[in-house]
Regions:
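Residue-level marker of beta-strand positions
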Residues: 39, 74-75, 83, 151
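A short, N-terminal "cap"/entry segment at the start of jelly-roll beta-barrel domains
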Residues: 1-28, 71-72, 91-93, 98-140
Length: 173
């Protein structure tokens, strides 16, 4: 693996919205870079979108008056089967992950409500803590907290991992 910055590798292009697919199919993952004063029209999807803002601010809106402002570090799980759009005044770089209605979701996540992944899980002295956010037979999305000096032994798990550092610093490898 390699360390990289989603925001640095997906900088704004003036006046444009740019998308980069990093995983296709069910539970796709796409990076979006929206230049200042751009938008994506509201569309209806039969699945949730987990929106994780990396940089800037993003307004997630619907046609029924629904409107949520997200800043860097914040996330929202969109509702299904309702028109949802995105717009930004200052620009936004974010990750979008599709989550099927049938996928198991942690009850701490409420569709339509803004939250921070880092606030969902505590730190405890000398411990590693993990929490499932969403999963199905082919995908597992978790968050973990590591107290200073803790870690995991080298191990293998099926599939690949995309790791977001939400707080602090650590060593991978």
């Amino acid at each position: 693996g390699k360390v990289f910055s989603i925001a640095k590798e997906n900088a704004y292009i003036p006046g444009c919205t740019v998308s980069k697919s990093i995983f296709d199919g069910e539970n796709y993952i796409i990076y979006f870079s929206m230049a200042p004063e751009t938008d994506i029209s509201a569309e209806i999807f039969p699945y949730h979108k987990l929106i994780l803002v990396e940089e800037g601010s993003l307004e997630v809106y619907g046609t029924d008056g629904y409107q949520r402002e997200l800043r860097a570090g914040e996330a929202v799980l969109t509702e299904t089967d309702k028109p949802i759009g995105m717009r930004t005044e200052e620009g936004a770089i974010y990750t979008e992950i599709s989550i099927s209605k049938e996928d198991s979701m942690n009850s701490a996540i409420k569709a339509g409500e803004v939250f921070k992944l880092a606030d969902l899980i505590p730190y405890q002295e000398g411990k590693v803590i993990n929490m499932d956010i969403a999963h199905n037979d082919k995908m597992k999305f978790i968050i973990m907290s590591f107290d200073k000096g803790t870690g995991l032994s080298e191990h293998a798990a099926p599939g690949e991992a995309l790791i977001f550092a939400l707080d602090g610093e650590g060593v991978i490898g």
